Amino acid sequence: ILIDHHPYPDDFANFTISDTSVSSTAELVFEFILSLNSINEIDKNIAECLYAGILTDTGNFSYNSSNPRTFEIAAELLKKKINKDHIFKNIYDNYALSRWKLLGYCLYEKRNILHEFKVGYISISKQELEDFDFVPGDTEGFVNYPLSVKGIVVSALFIEKNDIIKISFRSKGEYAVNELAKQYFNGGGHKNAAGGE
């Protein structure tokens, strides 16, 4: 079984549930459970996982969340007595000081804004990651910072890892970064959030 909300899911499963209009795979999992008339099987632990999936894929409900159904599902999960503030804190307020220092370094030294192209990007070398005691997850969300600059509609984050450069793309509006990632960087993703290498 494959449950995915990304465009062009892999074709390896006997049964696929795919819908790119939903906020997250967690939302699809909820709907799948609901379709089996098994809503009562969602206990607090499952509800916490589904809520965390929706929370992270929507950037705390700041994107991929214009469908009222996303909020209806979140409300159903809250009825399971989950602690949404605890979930938020564990995801977004749980970073090491080294991550904060790396972010400051990237925003001050490594950011590039190309106003004429409406593009901003950050690049980080393997050595720089080591210098800041990088652990997986430390660069989560860095790609979004250039989009906060007025007039910027596309952002990218380039991270050197061993023999490859990992790339994350974000965009606003009609700029389809998933097509860029697919065509040039062996990647893919959503229209406004994609990656490649």
Which residue stretches match the model-derived regions?
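N-terminal small/polar loop signature for handling phosphorylated ligands or for N-terminal nucleophile
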Residues: 1
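Short alpha-helices
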Residues: 5-73
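Hydrophobic helix-and-loop "lid/oligomerization" segment in the mid-to-C-terminal part
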Residues: 55-184, 189-197
